Regions:
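The beta1-alpha1 cofactor-binding region of Rossmann-like NAD(H)/NADP(H)-dependent oxidoreductases
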Residues: 62-72, 106
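Conserved NAD(P)H cofactor-binding loop of Rossmann-fold oxidoreductase domains
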Residues: 90-97
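Conserved glycine-rich Rossmann-like NAD(P)H-binding loop of the short-chain dehydrogenase/reductase
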Residues: 39-53
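A short, exposed helix-loop element centered on a Lys and neighboring polar residues
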Residues: 124-125
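Conserved glycine-rich cofactor-binding loop
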Residues: 18, 25-26
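Substrate-binding pocket helix/loop in short-chain dehydrogenase/reductase
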Residues: 98-101, 105-110
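A glycine-rich helix->loop->beta "capping" turn
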Residues: 76-89
Length: 132
């Protein structure tokens, strides 16, 4: 039986598509970016630090948990690529202490919202008009 992981990706599956992958230099984000690239997409990755290995993806160094970082990403994408077709919001994480929600302070909640929710909100708001 052939599974989807056994098949070689169609190199034109995402041909002509511009794909943004946040947090695209390591782990799941890196794998997602590589898969879109194998499918023929123009891939744009963001992260706070440059990728350790050279690749063919366009890299934008930015901290998307900040308004300045998301503005940098939006402006560069609109100026260079005139928008995107697909956005993968991969960036995120948690710095919550152990002990459950009762131990989480308002400051930790705000930090997690800034790191996990606002990047998607800001990027969607800035890039969605180019996707319609």
């Amino acid at each position: 039986m052939t599974t989807s992981s056994d098949r070689t990706p169609d190199p034109n599956e995402f041909g002509g598509k511009r794909v943004l992958v946040t947090g695209g230099t390591k782990g799941a984000g890196k794998a997602i970016a590589e898969r879109f690239q194998r499918g023929g997409a123009t891939v744009i990755i963001t992260a706070r630090s440059a990728p350790e290995e050279k690749n063919d993806n366009h890299f934008i160094q930015a901290d998307v948990s900040t308004p300045e970082g998301t503005s940098k990403v939006i402006n560069e994408i609109l100026n260079r690529f005139h928008g995107v077709d697909i956005i993968i919001h991969n960036v995120g994480g948690s710095s919550a202490p152990s002990g459950g929600f009762i131990t989480v302070t308002d400051e930790i909640w705000q930090q997690n919202i800034n790191e996990n929710l606002f990047p998607a909100v800001r990027l969607d708001r800035g890039l969605l008009p180019s996707m319609i």
